[in-house]
């Protein structure tokens, strides 16, 4: 599946606004999908990532920890910095990416999906839900995992290749992806949203439909497909 025709920068701005608007007054709220993090760590993390990505879009790889208070304002500032940087340098500017030198447009897509997954993380324990994101956007997140993150994980030695080929099917839009070569031993089917969340470890097998060799599927899914 080729990269979707998504206008990433307006979508990024929308998702960042929703994230900022969802930051609770009580930052001690637990975020179960992020281990032992509270909202404090999640908000600071996404703000730090936005600031780092803005640097990467300019060809500078520098990571700095953010402040220890004023997290909502810090997030808003870092989100704005990222948007302004991406707009200023343009999509074709030479940048550093997660897979080597490439265009700054890499970060348009990457930060949309970074924000989307963490928006899910933030809103879920607050019982806010996450509606209004088109299936094609979630499907693009699946494509990013299959075509970029999984191969990168293997290249970096963070995981072994999947031992058996597995097919993923978005039941709402009919798109298919495959990890591994050859005829798939199993299929995982769900709406694109659930597939994306599943691949990022946000939901489990109870939220998808599987078919085929269950034992081989289970072994394949032990691989760490994302960071």
Task: Label the predicted regions.
Residues 132-181, 187-188:
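Hydrophobic protein-protein interaction segments
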Residues 184-227:
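C-terminal interaction segments
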Residues 55-109:
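Hydrophobic/aromatic-rich structural module bridging two neighboring secondary-structure elements via a short loop
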Residues 1-13, 17-24, 221-227:
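Actinobacteria-biased recognition of intrinsically disordered, low-complexity terminal regions
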Residues 5-12, 68-75, 108-115, 138:
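Hydrophobic packing residues in well-ordered alpha-helices of helical domains and bundles
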Residues 17, 24-61, 99-156, 195:
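Short, contiguous alpha-helical
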């Amino acid at each position: 599946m080729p990269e979707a025709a998504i206008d990433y920068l307006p979508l990024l701005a929308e998702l960042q606004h929703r994230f900022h608007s969802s930051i609770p007054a009580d930052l001690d709220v637990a975020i179960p999908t992020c281990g032992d993090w509270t909202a404090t760590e999640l908000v600071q993390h996404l703000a730090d990532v936005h600031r780092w990505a803005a640097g990467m879009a300019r060809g500078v790889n520098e990571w700095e920890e953010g402040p220890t208070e004023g997290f909502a304002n810090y997030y808003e500032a870092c989100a704005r910095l990222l948007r302004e940087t991406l707009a200023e340098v343009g999509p074709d500017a030479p940048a550093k990416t997660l897979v080597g030198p490439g265009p700054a447009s890499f970060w348009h897509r990457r930060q949309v999906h970074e924000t989307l997954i963490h928006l899910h993380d933030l809103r879920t324990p607050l019982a806010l839900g996450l509606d209004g994101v088109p299936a094609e956007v979630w499907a693009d997140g699946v494509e990013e995992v299959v075509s970029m993150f999984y191969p990168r994980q293997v290249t970096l030695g963070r995981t072994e290749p999947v031992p058996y080929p597995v097919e993923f099917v978005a039941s709402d839009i009919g798109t298919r992806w495959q990890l591994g070569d050859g005829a798939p031993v199993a299929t995982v089917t769900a709406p694109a949203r659930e597939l994306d969340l599943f691949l990022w470890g946000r939901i489990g097998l109870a939220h998808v439909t599987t078919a085929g060799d269950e034992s081989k599927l289970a072994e394949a899914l032990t691989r760490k497909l994302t960071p």
